[in-house]
Amino acid sequence: MKSTIIGNAHDLNAAQEIWFIQNILFSGSEINIGYSPNILRDQTVIYLELNEISGELIKQLRLEKNKIVLYHMGDEFGRMSREQYRNCDLVIRNYYFDEIFSSKEDVEVIWAPCGFKTGIGPRESVYIKPASKRQWRSSFFGWLENSASYNGEREGFARIAPECGEDLFLQATSGFAMGWNIGLYSIAMESSVFAPCPAGNAPETIRLYDALELGCIPISLSHDFIISPNALGLIGPAPFPILNSWNELPTFLKSIKEKVSSSPRELDDMQARCIAWWTDYKIAIQRKIAQRIQTL
């Protein structure tokens, strides 16, 4: 059965990861701006929603004998209403909350990664710059003064960052998405071996996927979405470094420097493991979603 993604112009424009959504998560499905009942009939409709889920739209889609897959984005705090979930055939959403994915909803809910920003990728792994030839040991470009960040991670990261010295290139911004343009940001990330990924409003950040796509090794604290087999743990443990606290970052970066001095290939090997894992993961999540949609 044919699948078509639909969303209003505002949401499609605001979804920074739209290429990833269309081509990785939903296997290249067509996208329609808005709802066209004369076109969308007797097929699988993937309804992308960033804000309030429209029960009226779901009803209209049902009248045309469509199967409805809700792709629910943007619920960073897990507080949005899920009342309309039961009126869909399948729900796919990002931002992992165990109470949502382990609860007995009236419909199956599958987690999907946010993915990388459009323009970051897709990157062919054979053309990714080796870690050993990158300019900076690590870098962070983004908003540090986010008082709403999960468990105060941005504040904790900002406090310890100066202790990293020359091992961390830091470019702080004054707000969300107020930094360098996507081209310069990509170049800078591709010039960095590691990318610390402190949580934003939610533990899951787009930065982590930007880093993976660019062959930049993420550094994170431990979070459910990284560990759970229903999320990034789908194909086994993530191969990138997981710290207990951002206070460990200066020591970690220093230890890497010492390790590389005695084992020059260490960085390239770690990078290769991350690239291979991310490549396999994209295939696995695409297959999981496609197979589930085919059974509707």
Give the positions of each predicted feature:
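Nucleotide-sugar donor-binding catalytic core of glycosyltransferases
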Residues: 1-236, 242, 277-293
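A charged, aromatic-enriched C-terminal amphipathic alpha-helix characteristic of glycosyltransferases
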Residues: 254-296
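Short coil/turn linker and secondary-structure boundary residues
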Residues: 180, 244-247, 262
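Catalytic phosphate/metal-binding cores of nucleic-acid and nucleotide-processing enzymes, i.e., regions
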Residues: 186, 246-249, 274
